[in-house]
Amino acid sequence: MLILISPAKTLDYQSPLPTTRYTLPELLDNSQQLIHEARKLTPPQISTLMRISDKLAGINAARFNDWQPDFTPENARQAILAFKGDVYTGLQAETFSEDDFDFAQQHLRMLSGLYGVLRPLDLMQPYRLEMGIRLENARGKDLYQFWGDIITNKLNEALAAQGDNVVINLASDEYFKSVKPKKLNAEIIKPVFLDEKNGKFKIISFYAKKARGLMSRFIIENRLTKPEQLTGFNSEGYFFDEASSSNGELVFKRYEQR
């Protein structure tokens, strides 16, 4: 079983590390090509392209310029410990045991605009390059064209290595669009998280993102290997709703706190 999650915009390169183990990203040659393109952008161009403030654009221009391919624990950090968004709040990788990291390294993948696919312990240098950004490059007009089949092929390699054919899609639509489902040698299961609001169940972005992290943690902590085991997920008040679920989509609901 291979779990897919999105990266985060917020990064943490200061907190104490729970493990010193690390691996290196497998697609760094591609990352270098994107950095080459990104370095051509001025801070105002970055601000427009990414729809971010001038201050953030300046920070990210500096990151592109400082980036270099020789990753070490001194200039980079393990991806699962560097990302700090809502998904990662639910995941809480900073509390993982070494055995948890072992399982995650085999079964969890982070999709990335710059790095393509990251394993949890892959070192990464700080960046911001969302998958949906229209960064022109030698392979096309955006990052989807740049990555083409590369991400899908890398996921197929991971599935083959564990002798499995199930992908748990906990990534956002923006990131999962970088995967070619028809070329993926797997059944795709998508958990959906609905929260009650004024008597109606709907996707509330903040809660849904955190729930994706909670589900990832649930799979890792319990060493789950079969999709039917996911229905036991009950973290923070969520419960499986079989009636709302369908082939390939597992629906989890949570009542409003009153």
UniProtKB/Swiss-Prot annotation:
InterPro entries associated with the record: YaaA
Highest taxon above the source species: Bacteria
One BP term from GO: response to hydroperoxide
Pfam families membership: H2O2_YaaD
Annotated TM spans: none
UniProt GO cellular component terms: cytosol
Family under the similarity heading: Belongs to the UPF0246 family.
The protein's name in its UniProt record: UPF0246 protein YaaA
